[in-house]
């Protein structure tokens, strides 16, 4: 089966680099599915889970807190603001971040504080959703 080169990079490090049969991730206007030979595309991505279907049946999961996606016919590059390997996701930390963001929303003093708190809440909620999705998938295997 045909594959596509996939790189997921955060500001701190390269999170994933390898060949994949399929990539799914949260695009700005909805879920995107990328197969080898996909039409070139550049778009923003929302916080959420990136699923990379590699040969051999194992999927790699990476949580991204937004960023940019570039698709070329033979390559997919995800430039993430923040990226965390699926195995390194921590539900307790994500829940704590959600609570902090909700508390901050109750005490906003400016539009900038409001926007920052809303962004932090959206990221924490997306991370918790990604953890739940990953847990469901792992329970099937």
Curated annotation (Swiss-Prot):
Keywords, comma-separated and alphabetical: ATP synthesis, Cell inner membrane, Cell membrane, CF(1), Hydrogen ion transport, Ion transport, Membrane, Transport
Topology within the bilayer: Peripheral membrane protein
UniProt xrefs under InterPro entries: ATP_F1_dsu/esu_C_sf (IPR036794), ATP_synth_F1_dsu/esu (IPR001469), ATP_synth_F1_dsu/esu_N (IPR020546), ATP_synth_F1_esu_C (IPR020547), ATPsynth_dsu/esu_N (IPR036771)
Keyword ATP-binding recorded: no
One Gene Ontology term of the molecular function aspect: proton-transporting ATP synthase activity, rotational mechanism
Gene Ontology, cellular component aspect: plasma membrane; proton-transporting ATP synthase complex
Chief localisation class: membrane
Compartment(s) where it occurs, according to its Swiss-Prot or TrEMBL record: Cell inner membrane
PANTHER family in the cross-refs: ATP SYNTHASE DELTA/EPSILON CHAIN, ATP SYNTHASE EPSILON CHAIN, CHLOROPLASTIC
Function: Produces ATP from ADP in the presence of a proton gradient across the membrane.
Subunit (UniProt): F-type ATPases have 2 components, CF(1) - the catalytic core - and CF(0) - the membrane proton channel. CF(1) has five subunits: alpha(3), beta(3), gamma(1), delta(1), epsilon(1). CF(0) has three main subunits: a, b and c.
HAMAP family reported in the protein's UniProt record: ATP_synth_epsil_bac
Assigned protein family: Belongs to the ATPase epsilon chain family.
Protein name as it appears in the record: ATP synthase epsilon chain
């Amino acid at each position: 089966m045909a594959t596509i080169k996939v790189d997921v990079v955060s500001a701190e490090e390269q999170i994933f680099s390898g060949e994949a049969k399929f990539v799914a991730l949260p695009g700005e206007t909805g879920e995107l599915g990328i197969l080898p030979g996909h039409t070139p595309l550049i778009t923003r991505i929302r916080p959420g889970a990136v699923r990379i279907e590699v040969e051999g049946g194992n999927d790699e999961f990476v949580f991204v807190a937004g960023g940019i996606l570039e698709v070329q016919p033979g390559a997919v590059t995800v430039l993430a603001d923040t990226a965390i390997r699926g195995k390194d996701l921590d539900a307790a930390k994500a829940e704590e971040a959600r609570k902090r963001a909700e508390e901050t929303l109750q005490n906003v003093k400016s539009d900038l504080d409001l926007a920052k708190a809303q962004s932090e809440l959206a990221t924490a909620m997306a991370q918790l959703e990604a953890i739940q999705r990953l847990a469901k998938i792992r329970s099937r295997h």
